[in-house]
Amino acid sequence: MKQRTWPCRSEGSRFSSLSFLKPHDKDKRSRISSINKATAKSTTSSRSSSSSSSSRPPSNEFGDFSMLPYDILMKIAAPFSHPNLQAASLVCKSWRDALKPLRESMLLIRWGKKYKHGRGGVRANLDKALDSFLKGAMRGSTLAMVDAGLVYWERGEKEKAVNLYRRASELGDAVGQCNLGIAYLQVQPSNPKEAMKWLKQSAENGYVRAQYQLALCLHHGRVVQTNLLEATKWYLKAAEGGYVRAMYNISLCYSVGEGLPQNRKLARKWMKRAADHGHSKAQFEHGLALFSEGEMLKSVLYLELAERGGEAAATPVKEVVHQQLSATFGGQAVHHAIHQANNWRPLPVTR
C-alpha cells in the first residue's frame, strides 16, 4: 500500500498580516524590531538545542541487548537463522561479542552437516557429525540441538534425542517443538498430552510440518478426539504455507465436503497444485480428471509423471490414453508428451 505524507500544519494562525505603523511611530517600530530579533534568536537557539539532542545517540539508561543475562539472551537469539545472526552481529561491537558463541555454533553446524552427508570433500562420519552438533548445542544454538537430536534418534538413542528436542523447544525453536511432539507419539510409553501440546505450539509458530501433523491427529482421531473442523483449518494453513501433503489432503476434504463445505472448484485447484509440486497420487488423480474431460495431451503428461512416481494404477490408464492419442494425432503426440515429462520439474515444496 502506497503511503501518503500529509503536509505539515502551521502552528500559527491560518492568516497573517503585517503590522500597520504610521511613519512617525519610530519608538514603537524600534520596540517591535527588538522583540522580533529576540524571538528569532530564542527560536534558533531552541532549534539548535533540539537538533543537537536528536543527533546524540540514545542513552544506555535501560541497557541494551548485550547486557541481558546470558540465559535470556540465548532464549531470544538461539533460534536465529544464520543470516539473521550475521545481521544482528553487525549492529555494534557489544552485540557482536554477545553473539560470538552462536556464530561459532553456525560454523560447527556447517561442519556437522558435511560429516553427516559426506559433502564438501569430507568423508561421511556420523560420530564426527554428532560431535560438531553437540559442540554447537553447548554454545546455545537450537539448530544444533535439533540436528544432534536427529542423529541420536536415528541411532535409536531416543531418550537423548528427546532431551535435546526439549531444550530446543523451551528456547522457542519451532522445528524442535514439532520433533518433540512427534517423538512423544512414537516413544514407549507414548505421551499424547505432551505430543499435542508441542505440536500445537509449533503449528502456532508457523511451522507447516507441525500444522500438517496436528491436522492428521485431529482428522483421524489419533491420540485425541476427532475434530474435522480443526483438522481442515490446519490442513489449509499448511497447504497455503507450501506443504504438499496438506495440499493433497485439503483437496480431498473439499472434494467430499469433509470438515468444510463441498467445493469441486477448490478441490481441483489444490489437487493440481499438489500435482505440480510433485505429489504422485495427486498427479494420478489430476490426470484422471483431465482424461474424463477429454484433455488427452495434458492427461498423459500427469499420468506419465504419476507412473514414474510409483503409482502403478496410472499405467493401464496411460496406455489407454496413448492408444487414443496415437489414433487421433499419430505417434508424434505420445513422443511429445514423454518429452514434456522428461523436462518437467516440480515446483519447490516446503519440508
From Swiss-Prot:
Sel1-like repeat coordinates: 105-141
InterPro entries attached to this UniProt entry: F-box-like_dom_sf, F-box_dom, F-box_motif, Sel1-like, TPR-like_helical_dom_sf
Species whose genome carries this gene: Arabidopsis thaliana
Name of the protein this chain belongs to: F-box protein At1g70590
Listed SMART domains: SEL1
Compositionally skewed regions (Polar residues) per UniProt: 32-41
Disulfide bonds: none
Positions with biased composition (Low complexity): 42-59
Keyword annotations from UniProtKB, A to Z: TPR repeat
Pfam families the record matches: F-box, Sel1
Hydrolase among keywords: no
Domain F-box: 62-111
TPR repeat coordinates: 142-175
Keyword hit for Calcium: no
Region Disordered, annotated ranges: 1-60
